[in-house]
């Protein structure tokens, strides 16, 4: 029977049952409640074998922080194909329909967290940001520079956290590429729920707020996985999210967490790769960081995507871009920045460099430079100084960071 790929309609429960099956899980009632509360049904795509859903793809409508601006972005999620229907081209057909719809909607970029990064490079996604997972033994966690707290830290319950955390997050968003807007429903159903199967053996979540002169400017959410032996406690503190509007509040929160008694180790699986913790501890060797892929970014519509972010300096660049899956992006493009305002248009001028659309996805938020990609044999310099010219334009001051999987 022919597989029909089309916009989803109908009862969402079979859709999410297919999502769970594709990821090797079974639908829980609380999982369905969580999905249904934030599901954008009008943006979902399904593959049907008869009446049965065998493939799924969804989208969150986000505003994404990009260098110097925010842009509408499609947050691609719940993408899967049942094991019974793999290797039939279903994913490719869903990606085709989805990217066409994203472009038609006017979203110049799409982002996702990938279960397997190799999959999405076929459809033009590039490695848009990294995350750092850290492990630090508490007995070797002394800070290098003595630090007097600049504010206070207090515990809050989930209801009070829900009133305080969003404003702090939103204050940081425009300053950190990779942050995306969180709707009230996203906070309620994606961040604050604390079911046991989300805890991975740890206890319930704790929430703390940092305030300077009485004004909240940072927060942390963490869990403790208890572990005791004859020598005493050696529990692990897992940092779920730590966000602050200024460096002092960030360090105060880290000092508070590291100072909690009965803890043997502090772990955080998703920090910015330029988080100040690594340079703050006296023994950086004892802070073990494992860097991994985070956001994958697809430049869906090249001209508005490049015109929608800001650049480090004025200048101009001509690029030859290859894009097999979205051919409207392929060709020679001129980027001109004058008085901080970018202009992007097709051109017949000679290019200074050549790249694939996946390379622009890796460069767009500032995770990598053109020179780095050239060293990896991905970007080709076609005119002397082309790489330096490109990096002078696209360079950023902060590493991109996406603190939340979606």
Q: Where do the PLM segments sit?
A:
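Flexible glycine-/small-residue-enriched beta->alpha junction loops
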Residues: 127-149, 156-157
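Intrinsically disordered, low-complexity, positively biased terminal segments
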Residues: 1-13, 49, 66, 144-406
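Glycine/alanine-rich phosphate-binding loops at beta-alpha junctions
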Residues: 1-78, 82-84, 89-92
């Amino acid at each position: 029977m022919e597989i029909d790929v089309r916009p989803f309609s109908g009862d969402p429960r079979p859709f999410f049952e297919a999502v769970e099956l594709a990821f090797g899980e079974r639908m829980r009632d609380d999982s369905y409640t969580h999905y249904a509360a934030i599901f954008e049904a009008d943006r979902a795509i399904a593959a049907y074998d008869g009446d049965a859903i065998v493939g799924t793809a969804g989208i969150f409508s986000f505003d994404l922080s990009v260098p110097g601006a925010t842009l509408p972005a499609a947050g691609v999620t719940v993408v899967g194909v049942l094991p019974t229907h793999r290797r039939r081209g279903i994913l490719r057909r869903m990606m085709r329909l989805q990217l066409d719809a994203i472009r038609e909607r006017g979203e110049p970029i799409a982002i996702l967290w990938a279960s397997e990064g190799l999959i999405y490079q076929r459809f033009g996604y590039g490695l848009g940001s990294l995350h750092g997972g850290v492990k630090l033994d508490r007995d070797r966690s002394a800070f290098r520079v003595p630090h007097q707290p600049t504010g206070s830290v207090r515990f809050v319950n989930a209801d009070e956290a829900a009133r305080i955390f969003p404003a702090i997050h939103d204050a940081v968003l425009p300053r950190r590429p990779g942050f995306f807007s969180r709707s009230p429903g996203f906070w309620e159903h994606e961040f604050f729920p604390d079911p046991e199967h989300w805890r991975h053996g740890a206890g319930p979540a704790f929430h703390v707020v940092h305030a300077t002169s009485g004004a909240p400017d940072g927060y942390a959410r963490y869990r403790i996985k208890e572990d005791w032996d004859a020598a005493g406690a050696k529990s692990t503190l897992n940092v779920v999210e730590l966000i602050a509007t200024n460096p002092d509040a960030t360090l105060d929160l880290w000092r508070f967490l590291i100072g909690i008694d009965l803890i043997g180790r502090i772990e955080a699986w998703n920090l910015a790769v330029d988080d100040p913790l690594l340079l703050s501890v006296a023994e950086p060797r004892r802070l073990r960081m494992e860097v991994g892929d985070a956001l994958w970014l697809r430049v869906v519509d090249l001209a508005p995507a490049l015109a929608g972010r800001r650049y480090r300096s004025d200048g101009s660049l001509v690029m030859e871009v290859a894009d097999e899956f979205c051919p409207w992006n392929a060709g020679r493009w001129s980027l001109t920045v004058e008085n901080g305002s970018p202009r992007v248009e097709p051109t017949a001028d000679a290019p200074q460099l050549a790249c694939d659309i996946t390379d622009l996805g890796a460069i767009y938020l500032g995770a990598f430079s053109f020179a780095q990609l050239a060293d990896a044999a991905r970007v080709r310099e076609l005119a002397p100084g082309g790489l330096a010219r490109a990096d002078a334009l696209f360079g950023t001051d902060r590493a991109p960071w996406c603190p939340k999987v979606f």
